[in-house]
Amino acid sequence: MIIANNDCFALQTAHTTYLFRKDAAGNLLHLYYGESIELDEGQLASVCDLLQPVIKNPNGCSLIADTALPAQCLDDVCLEISSRGKGDMREPFVELVLADGSRTGDFRYESFEIIDGLQSPDGLPGAYDAENQAQSLMITLTDRNSEVKLELIYGVLEECDCITRYARLINGGEETVRVERLMSMQLDMSKGALKINDFHGDWAREMNRNETILRSGKYINDTGVGFSSNRANPLFLWADTETTQDYGDCYATNLIYSGNHREYAEAGGHGKMRILSGINPDFFEWELAGGEVFCAPQAVMTYSHRGYQGVSRQLHHFVREHIVRGEWKHKERPILINSWEAMYFDVQEKKLLRLAKVAAETGIELFVLDDGWFGKRNNDASSLGDWYDNKEKLPEGLAGLSQKLHKLGMKFGIWVEPEMVSEDSDLYREHPDWAVRIPGKEHAFGRNQMILDLTRQEVREYILESMSDVFTRGQVDYVKWDMNRNMSDYYSQALPTSRQGEFAHRYILGLYQVLYTLTEKFPHILFEGCASGGNRFDLGMLCYMPQIWASDNTDAISRASIQNSYSYGYPQSVIAAHVSGCPNHQTLRITPLPTRFAVASVGILGYECNLCDVSREDMEEIRAEILLYKEWRSVLQFGEWYRLYESSEKQSVYDTDVTRWNIVSPDKSKAVGIMIKGQTLANYAYRTFRTKGLDAGSNYHFYNRSMRYDIHRMGDLINTMAPVHVKQDSLLHGAISKFIRLDGEKEDKIVSGAILDQCGIPLAQNYAGTGYEQNTALYQDYDARMYFMEKV
């Protein structure tokens, strides 16, 4: 709900209130964002009067922007938007260079409008409201130094406690203005210190959560690689310094954008904090001619007094209901097998069909043909852009392979990388000017490839035509849309010299145009985004593709950390995760198959290994995993995902190397608990599993996934039980292991949701080096457990 009264504005969600007002000089002052304040239109002005600081005397060395407020310095107040040149020395929201070369911005309030529905920026993806219950507020400001207007557009999504924001510049004059910065959101707060959370990394090391206390100076989270990047995800959280997972004031913002971005947290000199998020100004400028409009990307922000978990719940709801769209929004996603780690580039139809038949027998539903099927593609040095079938590998082409896979009862998926071109390709030889490179200068290659210039209409048309042909002739059910290099040599041969600073943003606009057209043309295809893993895992891509490959690192222990960090702002229904072979191809780590499954099950499950080479025992395990996942798929994909005691704040110092999750069905009738161990500790026998999110007034049947263990796990300790001596790893040891398995522990209790959530229940005793009994839990390094809860 939006309330406006004279010069005061309130954005009300179910549990939060956002207040700001116009001052006597026309500046917009931010007053409050936090827990809900009950107020109506008649109370709004008096509440704003109470919250507005009374300034009688200016601070030393302050600059006074307007004689109407002779004591007010803009550097010492909380503002809705900021610019340079009038006394606010902090990072600005907007920066313009006018025709005379001046840079001072002085935007003052002009008018407001309340609009039914949610607004989105032109040419960019944005949040939507399928129920059409949202409202938007548009505030118009005018620059006193030019004829430029600035529109601030707020959207209120009451049920998920989220507010969307973006800005629009309109040049109402005749002279061209250069835009050097236009952010998407600003939040000024009277806070002396904040705990900043950002998520950084690199290829195969995405989403490392970094927590920093900021008391002075600036904290910057940004990327200049051309895309949202694995180096700095646009998800950005800040909280009071005492905030925990479940308690305390916590805020978050995320950007609905896939290009270069920057998030600032700045501690000013007067006990105030400023948060900014938007396009990275270091890689951006825009010529705004008379009559033209420029829109910044949309951002979302949220607040919860229930700590990081509260913010996560709200962002998960926002992504599921207001970002992901189309046929697959609420539809259960199929279990897939991907050919990449099984074959890499060495794809042949016979090998593919052999793998597909084995996969179909296990219950896998979708076969994905990864890289290597097109042009003359035998390695990563050629053929990107040449999207015709390699008939040496696929004698009957995609159409023939697809038909055979469909006859097996499987869906057919294909890997493509449409934004790229190889120097050794027919496309590049015909259109060298379509590549992003500076003519006559040495080019920086990545993975032996270049980026196609999506700022050009003819390039976008080529991608649309070639991909439409691939999807149609292949009768494709699923597309993995990859992008495997960062931008370099920013330059378009189609742009004039004065507009080269627009290239990076224009590229993203071109990409969105392509994605919109294809997803509208092929609404039944399940699209999965990928960018060497998580190099473009963002809300912008999720507006077109309902799931994204989270990381090229398929190691279960690495993935547990990566997926745990994604959970701060993204639900598991958008995270693609695979069970791969061991030793893992990225880390060479060996982890048990049940652990690999447990981690990958919290997301969109796939397998990425050569099932034709899997042992009989492992094949039985995989069949059991797939049956289990299908039974619990709706919970695992669309349930509420809770982190259980993520940090050491509620764990023993001996128990911090454990990841715990709980996924609860929307109606709280079912839940899945997961515990993933790191390295095993000696003499640590007892653990408790405590849940979150259950119905306190109901009883649940709590039980675990039963396990049986190979006796090799006990080594020569088998001789403490065997009637004859058995040499470790001998033929006799191997023969015994074929017939005898050790039963794992069994958990089987009826317990209330209140006890599970508030107390937790003790689990079976771990093996601790002092003896083995019938119900002892045998934990080795990197083991995992899955627990199930059903209302009774």
Predicted regions: what is each one?
Residues 422, 427-461, 505-613:
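Glycan-recognition surfaces
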Residues 95, 104-109, 286-305, 781-790:
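Short Pro-Gly-centered flexible turn/kink motifs
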Residues 680-792:
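C-terminal beta-sandwich/jelly-roll accessory domains of carbohydrate-active enzymes
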Residues 15, 167, 291, 337, ...:
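Conserved, mostly hydrophobic/aromatic
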Residues 236-237, 245, 650-696:
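Carbohydrate-binding surface patches
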Residues 7-14, 18, 28-266, 282, ...:
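Polysaccharide-binding surfaces and accessory modules of carbohydrate-active proteins
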Residues 328-465, 478:
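Aromatic-lined carbohydrate-binding/catalytic grooves of carbohydrate-active enzymes
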Residues 168, 174-177, 257, 268-319:
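Extended acidic/polar, glycine-enriched regions
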